[in-house]
Design a protein with these regions (language model features):
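P-loop NTP-binding site
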Residues: 190-298
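Canonical P-loop GTPase G-domain recognition
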Residues: 119, 128-186
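Conserved glycine(s) of the Walker
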Residues: 22, 161, 252
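Active-site glycine-centered loops adjacent to acidic/histidine catalytic or metal-binding residues
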Residues: 64, 125, 155
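Conserved, well-folded catalytic cores of nucleic-acid-processing
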Residues: 33, 52-56, 86, 90-93, ...
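Catalytic P-loop NTPase motifs of RecA-like helicase/translocase cores
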Residues: 45, 68-70, 102-103, 130-131, ...
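Conserved C-terminal guanine-recognition region of P-loop GTPase G domains, centered on the G4
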Residues: 57, 81-149, 222-224
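Conserved G1/Walker A P-loop phosphate-binding module
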Residues: 1-81, 85-87
């Protein structure tokens, strides 16, 4: 092994925690790219998404995961499978909580972290909306739950204390060669990001159960010299939801399409021609066949 390889560190840093604590915002900020969609609604993230940060002597493979929940249907069970896999193959666990919650509702996962062999870095996010006393109380509570964890108060939104978190990650990476080529920044392809961008706009523009009843599939993705031609199907579970997604005279769907196209053009750095369609599939959240088609695992 060369001297360079002896010094090189690389590993998988898997981000887990409850819904809506800022896991996706944290990963996007650490990676420097918007790879995970972000909304104010819980359970926005459904897949495990990797973001890779490279330096001369390190490679960090971040992995954003769905928020921990008790599954009510097969889609959510698949989401929790992503979380369990992430715990099992981590070199470092980045457990994210915030100043709004206490983690005692996650007894099962806290017990797993107490027994795990790899380093655990615990991030108490959103300290910008809390008092110093509240943050200190939470830090002490978490020290009792996870005595071996490295604990950081932070604000992913305000980028507070992220440099120290980054340094702790690099210091705790195993000595290893890079897992991916140094010019790779994610494991997902452009079709995946196109579908996620559309899904984000659905979460931002509709309320109640509608966003949770939708899935987006890219049926066509053609790269031309000047633009991408993309056709996406939004699957819903009921005819009434289809009507809500389309809206009066198609205006709601048009708004989603415009917002998605603008973000795709910024992300892909190329013009986009986007077509959206809406179809009804009552069983997609429970059908193993459909879930596999949409990229979920069993």
């Amino acid at each position: 092994m060369s001297e360079t390889n002896k010094r090189h560190r690389a590993g998988f840093v898997n981000i887990i925690g409850n819904p809506n604590v800022g896991k996706s915002t944290l990963m996007n900020t650490l990676v420097g790219e918007k790879l995970s969609i972000v909304t104010a609604k819980a359970q926005t993230t459904r897949h495990r998404i990797m973001g890779i940060v490279n330096g001369d002597d390190y490679q960090i493979v971040y992995s954003d995961t769905p928020g921990i929940l008790k599954p009510n249907y097969r889609l959510q069970q698949s989401m929790m499978n992503f979380v369990d896999t992430a715990i099992g193959d981590a070199d470092i666990i980045l457990y994210v909580t915030d100043t709004v919650e206490k983690g005692d509702k996650n007894d099962e996962y806290i017990a797993k972290l107490q027994k795990i062999d790899c380093p655990v870095i615990l991030v108490i996010n959103k300290i910008d909306i809390s008092s110093q006393q509240q943050v200190l109380e939470l830090m002490n509570w978490w020290k009792e739950q996870l005595p071996k964890a490295i604990i950081f108060p932070a604000s992913a939104q305000e980028k507070f204390n992220l440099d120290n978190i980054f340094d702790a990650i690099v210091d705790n990476l195993p000595v290893a060669p890079a897992w991916y080529d140094k010019d790779v920044f994610t494991d997902k392809n452009l079709r995946f990001f196109a579908s996620e961008i559309v899904r984000e706009k659905i979460f931002l523009n509709y309320k109640d159960e509608v966003p949770y009843s939708c899935e987006v599939e890219i049926e066509e993705f053609k790269e031309g010299t000047e633009r991408y031609d993309i056709s996406a199907v939004i699957y819903v579970m009921r005819d009434t939801q289809k009507g809500i997604i389309i809206g009066k005279a198609g205006q709601a769907l048009k708004k989603v399409g415009t917002q998605a196209r603008i973000e795709m053009e910024d992300f892909f750095q190329k013009k986009v021609f986007l077509r959206l369609f809406v179809k009804v599939d009552p069983d997609w959240r429970e059908s193993k066949k459909e879930l596999r088609r949409f990229g979920y695992e069993y």
